[in-house]
């Protein structure tokens, strides 16, 4: 946890903190509760949210100390449930929802000095805007968007926040609490940004699974020239309840591919966050059909809309669930791809159900345990389609990954080698589910970029 997991009461003699006390059930429980404790240690912590068996977190006191605001999920065992903002009267223990008008999960929480307004961020249609919520009636007012607001602090009638975009790392901005008079107060890395060639980006929309609207982004190569065609990097996000949108990342950043001369396509398929909870829920039990249909339709739409995309030179890349999808399309949609990149992806969903440290995740997504409903785990299991694999694949795996353990990546590479498919394995002994160390990140990008260029530029295998 971090500082958002606890809050001091205004009187300074007690605090509330979020903790999961699950014993041996911790691996399949998402039941975090809020406990109130005095600092003198004379009384045991009191569970304020024992009635909710799902996730309770992010406590914030009202200025008078009489009300506790916090974020809460409703469905036990579902880590991607919607976080609602709740208000609890501490004297009575009664709680009500404040954010009913927001259909997306609240990401963070702060309160105004007068106790009348809550501030929160939430993913929304490929971005992460900042909202002000009237505590009395729940009315939400948009304060800032045009990118992703990650952090914010309230001071008097102003809000200081960071915002990043697909073409800028985080910068500091200041706005009035009503969203007016926004101004930028920092230009971090000014010289580096000025010297960097950026790929222009655009959001697009198409009709996907169930005749519903689906969104995506295209990023032009940094060296874009009108009339030319460019190879494609088709990025598939993880989660699967996640999003690739208008925000900056020091891991999967589309500008790194645009800078190498690739055009980038990213689809927020069914299951993505920021499009309402029903949209997010739709992927559970459907890992291999609904999102695949969106990816196929989104790819076709992008090819038709953006004539600079060269479909004869395309590679698909993904991590975590994105890596699962790379394995899945290797056996179910191989035709468009010159190469694939699978980072920490699931190879065998049934084995994943026994090996991951997040049992709640696989059990929710598959509707039960692998011994109770094995057929659910096999329905969209990439291992059952290896016989159809043929596309060259780079496999990346962290040996400290307990989310999707190393045997998944090693098994993927073994299958590729056994089938005599051109493949490479990049194994990081000191990384977990993410590549976090700077030198390892450089090696990751160098290896991935070389792999993409090898298969999209006509170079002979080495």
Where are the regions that the model predicts?
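Short beta-strand element of the alpha/beta-hydrolase
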Residues: 220, 228-238
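Short loop/turn segments that connect beta-strands within beta-propeller blades
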Residues: 38-42, 89-93, 134-138, 176-180
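Hydrophobic beta-strand positions that form the internal "hydrophobic ladder"
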Residues: 15, 65-69, 117-118, 159
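A flexible loop/linker signature enriched in serine peptidases of the S9 family
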Residues: 1-3, 18-33, 47-60, 71-86, ...
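Active-site-proximal cap/loop segments of hydrolase catalytic domains
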Residues: 253, 258-259, 266-462
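The serine-hydrolase catalytic nucleophile loop
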Residues: 229, 240-254, 269, 407-408
């Amino acid at each position: 946890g971090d500082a958002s997991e606890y809050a001091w009461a205004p009187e300074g003699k007690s605090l509330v903190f979020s903790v999961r006390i699950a014993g041996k059930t911790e691996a399949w429980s998402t039941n975090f509760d809020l406990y109130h404790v005095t600092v003198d240690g004379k009384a045991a912590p009191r569970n304020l949210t024992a009635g909710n068996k799902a996730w309770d977190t992010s406590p914030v006191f009202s200025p008078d100390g009489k009300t506790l605001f916090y974020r809460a999920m409703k469905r036990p065992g579902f880590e991607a449930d919607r976080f609602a903002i709740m208000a609890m009267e501490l004297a009575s223990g009664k709680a009500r929802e404040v954010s009913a008008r927001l259909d997306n999960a609240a990401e963070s929480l702060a309160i105004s000095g007068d106790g009348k307004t809550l501030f929160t961020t939430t993913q929304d249609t490929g971005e992460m805007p900042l909202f002000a919520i009237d505590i009395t009636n729940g009315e939400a007012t948009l304060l800032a968007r045009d990118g992703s607001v990650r952090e914010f602090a309230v001071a008097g009638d102003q809000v200081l926040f960071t915002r990043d975009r697909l073409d800028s790392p985080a910068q500091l901005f200041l706005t009035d609490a009503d969203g007016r008079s926004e101004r930028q107060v920092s230009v971090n890395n000014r010289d580096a940004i000025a010297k960097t060639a950026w790929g222009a980006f655009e959001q697009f929309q198409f009709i996907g699974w169930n005749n519903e609207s689906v969104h995506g982004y295209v990023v032009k190569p940094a060296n874009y020239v009108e009339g030319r065609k460019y190879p494609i990097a088709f990025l598939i996000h993880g989660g699967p309840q996640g999003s690739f949108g208008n925000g900056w990342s020091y891991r999967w950043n589309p500008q790194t591919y645009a800078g190498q001369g690739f055009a980038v396509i990213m689809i927020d398929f069914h299951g993505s966050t920021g499009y309402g909870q029903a949209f997010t829920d739709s992927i559970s039990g459907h890992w291999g059909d609904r999102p695949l249909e969106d990816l196929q339709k989104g790819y076709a739409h992008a090819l038709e809309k953006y004539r600079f995309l060269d479909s004869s030179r395309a590679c698909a890349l993904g991590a975590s669930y994105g890596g699962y999808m790379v394995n899945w399309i290797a056996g179910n949609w191989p035709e468009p791809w010159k190469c694939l990149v699978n980072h920490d992806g699931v190879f065998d969903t049934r084995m994943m159900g026994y090996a991951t440290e997040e049992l709640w995740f696989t059990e929710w997504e598959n509707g039960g345990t692998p011994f109770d409903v094995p057929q659910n785990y096999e329905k969209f299991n990439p291992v059952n389609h290896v016989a159809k694999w043929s596309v060259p694949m780079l496999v990346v795996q962290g040996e400290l990954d307990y989310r999707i353990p190393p045997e998944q990546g090693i098994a993927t590479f073994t299958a590729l080698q056994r089938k005599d498919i051109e493949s490479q394995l990049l194994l990081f002994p000191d990384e977990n589910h993410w590549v976090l160390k700077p030198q390892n990140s450089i090696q990751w990008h160098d290896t991935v970029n070389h792999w993409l260029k090898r298969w999209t530029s006509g170079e002979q295998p080495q």
